[in-house]
């Protein structure tokens, strides 16, 4: 029984020392906020304080619960630096494993749950330390952000810059087309010449797409040096031939492709002479063509081609005049009628005119069947008008009354 008061006295004595220690800690931490020189000493001493709390909590259970409320300032003082260290470690240790990052996040959430009502005060402490103490981990956040901002452009500048950009390619394609036309080469000639010279055979479509900028950027960059080399060789070839006359033009044409034939322009006086010769003989023979070429000091092939083109032009000019008109439907009907009328003899008409006038002049007689002396078939002339083509009996050609009845003007009225 005597030992129990001694133990309680020792516990109270220990609690007194603990309270003295907490007061001393609060003073030290307040000095840490006001002064910047004690930052390193506090960082080394603060991590040991949670161990003292754990040892003290293991001592008297009932009595420590009563004094636990008095230790809230100490918990606040301990939580502030640990929160700062964990935040700085979380930002600085991005290259570490994911498990360590998860543990730090859990530690932050536990500290926030234990703090409870003390979160606004810890926020104020964080703001004050971040502003007043550049040596603390708060300043390391800004330095880390600045370092990250400096290292960021390295990720975007991965692709190196190409010396030949789109503007240079567009300019080269335009100049290449102009110089190629000036030299007299076609797009197909360029493709064949590049195949003979450099071993890279290109089609006419590829050269056309290059000049029109319809190829991809990568293919344009590959094709540009080859075309530039061919263009320089083609332009320097005539100057070399002037220096060395032994060089044959056929060899150059085989090397750089087939040159396009230039359009022949004929003078006005020569054209008039050729027109006169064409009026005399539109289709001269080979000997006459050679004689005309010698007289006009021209090539025989040029004269021959001119006569061929002139004959084609003459066909185009005279073609609408020579085409016969399509005969209409009534033409085929009128031709045999006119022939038959022209072949009839007019002598019976004068002989029997008086006998047929009375029968043809009356409109009633046209609707009635004719008399046996008329020489027509039993069908009446009124019914024959309804048919599209009247049928005339061959025996009526000998009788003048039938012919007069068909051709008299009053009959149609």
Curated annotation (Swiss-Prot):
<dbReference type="Pfam" id="PF00157">
    <property type="entry name" value="Pou"/>
</dbReference>
<keyword id="KW-0804">Transcription</keyword>
<feature type="region of interest" description="Disordered">
    <location>
        <begin position="1"/>
        <end position="26"/>
    </location>
</feature>
<keyword id="KW-0371">Homeobox</keyword>
<dbReference type="InterPro" id="IPR001356">
    <property type="entry name" value="HD"/>
</dbReference>
<feature type="compositionally biased region" description="Low complexity">
    <location>
        <begin position="354"/>
        <end position="398"/>
    </location>
</feature>
<dbReference type="InterPro" id="IPR013847">
    <property type="entry name" value="POU"/>
</dbReference>
<dbReference type="InterPro" id="IPR010982">
    <property type="entry name" value="Lambda_DNA-bd_dom_sf"/>
</dbReference>
<keyword id="KW-0539">Nucleus</keyword>
<dbReference type="GO" id="GO:0000978">
    <property type="term" value="F:RNA polymerase II cis-regulatory region sequence-specific DNA binding"/>
</dbReference>
<feature type="domain" description="POU-specific">
    <location>
        <begin position="161"/>
        <end position="235"/>
    </location>
</feature>
<dbReference type="InterPro" id="IPR050255">
    <property type="entry name" value="POU_domain_TF"/>
</dbReference>
<feature type="region of interest" description="Disordered">
    <location>
        <begin position="346"/>
        <end position="398"/>
    </location>
</feature>
<dbReference type="GO" id="GO:0006357">
    <property type="term" value="P:regulation of transcription by RNA polymerase II"/>
</dbReference>
<dbReference type="GO" id="GO:0000981">
    <property type="term" value="F:DNA-binding transcription factor activity, RNA polymerase II-specific"/>
</dbReference>
<keyword id="KW-0238">DNA-binding</keyword>
<protein>
    <recommendedName>
        <fullName>POU domain, class 2, transcription factor 3S</fullName>
    </recommendedName>
</protein>
<feature type="DNA-binding region" description="Homeobox">
    <location>
        <begin position="259"/>
        <end position="318"/>
    </location>
</feature>
<dbReference type="InterPro" id="IPR017970">
    <property type="entry name" value="Homeobox_CS"/>
</dbReference>
<comment type="function">
    <text>Transcription factor that binds to the octamer motif (5'-ATTTGCAT-3') and regulates cell type-specific differentiation pathways.</text>
</comment>
<dbReference type="InterPro" id="IPR000327">
    <property type="entry name" value="POU_dom"/>
</dbReference>
<dbReference type="Pfam" id="PF00046">
    <property type="entry name" value="Homeodomain"/>
</dbReference>
<comment type="similarity">
    <text>Belongs to the POU transcription factor family. Class-2 subfamily.</text>
</comment>
<dbReference type="GO" id="GO:0005634">
    <property type="term" value="C:nucleus"/>
</dbReference>
<dbReference type="InterPro" id="IPR009057">
    <property type="entry name" value="Homeodomain-like_sf"/>
</dbReference>
<dbReference type="InterPro" id="IPR000972">
    <property type="entry name" value="TF_octamer"/>
</dbReference>
């Amino acid at each position: 029984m005597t030992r129990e008061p001694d133990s309680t006295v020792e516990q109270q004595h220990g609690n007194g020392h603990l309270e003295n220690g907490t007061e001393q800690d609060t003073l030290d931490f307040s000095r840490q906020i006001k002064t910047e020189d004690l930052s390193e000493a506090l960082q080394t001493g603060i991590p040991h304080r949670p161990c003292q709390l754990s040892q003290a909590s293991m001592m008297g259970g009932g009595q420590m619960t009563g004094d636990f409320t008095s230790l809230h300032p100490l918990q606040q003082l301990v939580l502030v630096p640990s929160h700062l260290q964990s935040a700085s470690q979380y930002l600085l240790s991005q290259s570490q494993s994911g498990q360590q990052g998860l543990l730090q996040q859990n530690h932050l959430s536990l500290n926030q749950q234990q703090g409870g009502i003390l979160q606004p005060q810890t926020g104020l402490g964080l703001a004050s330390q971040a502003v007043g103490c550049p040596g603390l981990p708060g300043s390391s956040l800004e330095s880390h952000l600045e370092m990250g901002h400096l290292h960021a452009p390295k990720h975007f500048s991965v692709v190196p810059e190409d010396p030949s950009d789109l503007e240079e390619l567009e300019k080269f394609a335009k100049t290449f087309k102009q110089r190629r036309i000036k030299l007299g080469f076609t797009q197909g000639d360029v493709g064949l010449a590049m195949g003979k010279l450099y071993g890279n055979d290109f089609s006419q479509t590829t050269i056309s797409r290059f000049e029109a900028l319809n190829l991809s950027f990568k293919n344009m960059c590959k094709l540009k040096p080859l075309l530039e080399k061919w263009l320089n060789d083609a332009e320097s070839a005539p100057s070399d031939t002037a220096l060395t006359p032994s060089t044959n033009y056929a060899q150059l044409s085989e090397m750089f492709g087939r040159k396009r034939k230039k359009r022949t322009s004929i003078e006005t006086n020569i054209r008039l002479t050729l027109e006169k010769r064409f009026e005399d003989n539109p289709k001269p023979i080979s000997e006459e063509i050679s004689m005309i070429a010698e007289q006009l000091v021209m090539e025989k092939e040029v004269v021959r081609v001119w006569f061929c083109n002139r004959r084609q032009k003459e066909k185009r000019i005279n073609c609408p005049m020579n085409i016969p008109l399509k005969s209409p439907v009534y033409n085929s009907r009128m031709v045999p009628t006119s022939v038959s009328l022209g072949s009839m003899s007019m002598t019976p008409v004068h002989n029997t005119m008086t006998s047929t006038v009375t029968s043809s002049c009356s409109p009633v007689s046209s609707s009635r069947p004719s008399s046996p002396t008329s020489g027509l078939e039993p069908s009446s002339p009124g019914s024959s008008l309804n048919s599209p083509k009247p049928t005339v009996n061959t025996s009526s050609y000998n009788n003048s009354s039938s012919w007069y009845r068909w051709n008299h003007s009053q009959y149609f009225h």
